Amino acid sequence: MKGLIIDMNYYEEIKNELIDVEVYNTVKEYSKNRYTSEKYYNVGKMIIEAQGGEERAKYGDGLIKEYAVKLVKEVDKKYDITTLKRIRQFYLMIQKGATMWHQLSWSHYRELLPINNINMINYYINICINQSLSVRDLKEKIKNKEYDRLTNETKLKLATKEDITLMDNIKNPIVIKNKYDTNIISEKMLKELILDNIETFMNELGEGFCYIGNEYKIKLGVVYNYIDILLYNIKYNCYVVVELKVTELKKEHIGQIQVYMNYIDENVKTIYQDKTIGIIVAKHNNKYVIRYSSNPKVVCTEFELV
């Protein structure tokens, strides 16, 4: 009998929190999602406590079922057992170390709940905040396995909160939407696909990129050369030369992009900007070519057509 009284006390607190959510949502449309997240955190905590703690909560949902039956009748039909389980899972996710959780909406968190890796969750939370991602944008990034396409070194840096370089943020492979009926494409076709979705391409490279131009003309002696794509990164304060290759990376590709980088450094960059970065987007990487390249500011990443 005593246990039942305690459970009902928790139930009344949970009910009041959820009623607050429903009332608030009718008058504070602009901020209701964040308010909902905060209230659901409180509800999740009370559910765990009512079940006797996290360990005991793993072995049964009888109490949640009882709560759900009453809440559906007394508050709103959306508070069924599935929703209450999500709310409980949300609380546990925060307890495991999800950061800055109060800055996202409940709609965002519903997409993150199926993820078990807390480092992956924090990665997506951070990019949602930094890039002001919609729920649709977040779903797309999760679907494209953006976190999985980071290097292990970058994942370790993120987990230990070390400083991240521009090159750490580059995904491998870069995902590019293909409008053609074939996966065998020319460099011209590859460039067209990228320019059709330049914002998506820059997001694949990381944060802070701005588009300057394509076929950027430079003059080497009496001969004109053309940089495939020239970008600028405002976060890292440097120009970024992008060269596209539909073959495996070759040593001459390194030499070519280094010439372009040196030109930008000498003729375009100011003394207040950092040295130019070079990114080669190739069909296949060659780790030995990169390994023995003398320039640490050159990186190669592969592309994948989807």
Predicted region positions:
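Basic, low-complexity intrinsically disordered segments
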Residues: 1-306
